[in-house]
Amino acid sequence: MGILEKKTAGPGGAARKTTTRAAGMAAEDRALAHLQAAGLRLLARNYRTPGRGGGEIDLILRDRDGTLVFVEVRSRASDAYGGAGASIGAAKRRRIVFAARHYLLRWPSPPPCRFDAVLVSGDAVQWLQAAFDAG
């Protein structure tokens, strides 16, 4: 058994990974419903750059004013360790910006853009508009 297998093996290893993925998808579903109720229109979900070392954007939407909104969805069962928002560090933001720039290559004249975060914690959904910038 290799090192990677040892890290995921054990009680509930595979089941935990599936449960975590399902919880993440459920949080994205809740975030999307919240944003659509606010008038945003979905353009892409789980957009990934090709190759290794790229980035992923959970949701890409268009706001009513035409702004392209790149959304990172974070979910935590509790507010321990800073809650959901604390998990969007500098490296994660760089990967999101990298993926956004890749996505924008398809636009002949890119619209204004914004980077939002939606934090899902328990029953609460918190939408942080302009949570960070591309700089």
UniProtKB/Swiss-Prot annotation:
Task: Extract the GO molecular function terms from the UniProt entry.
Answer: nucleic acid binding
Q: Give the protein family.
A: Belongs to the UPF0102 family.
Superkingdom to which the source organism belongs: Bacteria
Q: Say which species the protein is native to.
A: Paracidovorax citrulli (strain AAC00-1) (Acidovorax citrulli)
Region of interest: Disordered: 1-21
What Pfam families does this protein's entry cite? UPF0102 (PF02021)
Lineage of the source organism? Bacteria, Pseudomonadati, Pseudomonadota, Betaproteobacteria, Burkholderiales
Q: Which protein, by its recorded name, is this? A: UPF0102 protein Aave_0630
Q: According to the UniProt entry, where is the signal peptide?
A: none
